[in-house]
Amino acid sequence: GFSLFVSRRNPQLAQSLACASAIGVALRAAGLRPTPHHAMNADGIGRPWADEANGVYYYDNLVVLKYTRLPGVLLEAGVIINRDEERELATPARRALTAEAVAAGLQACGVTSGGGSARMQGN
């Protein structure tokens, strides 16, 4: 299953969470499911949910999320310790399905592409 992460230390938390949730909605609409294993309190994981229905967790101290001044989301597309999922993630069809869903989620939260770069609408 997939996981999405945002940091409460990111100054753009509301936008980060909105985009992460939109990506989660799109991934679920594509037939993919979030994994709950990051919320389990084993092996020091125990991450709190930000949006359980859409697979979004808080990961406050992850450097790439907390130090950016822009909205930030980290996607874990699957769990490779699950051998079946690892094999599926290696297929072009699964990668395309994931990429299309992420693109739809980004579009839903107002990220557009143009001129070779992505930007938030309204910024």
Indicate where each model-derived feature is located.
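Active-site-proximal helix/loop segments of hydrolytic enzymes
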Residues: 1-123
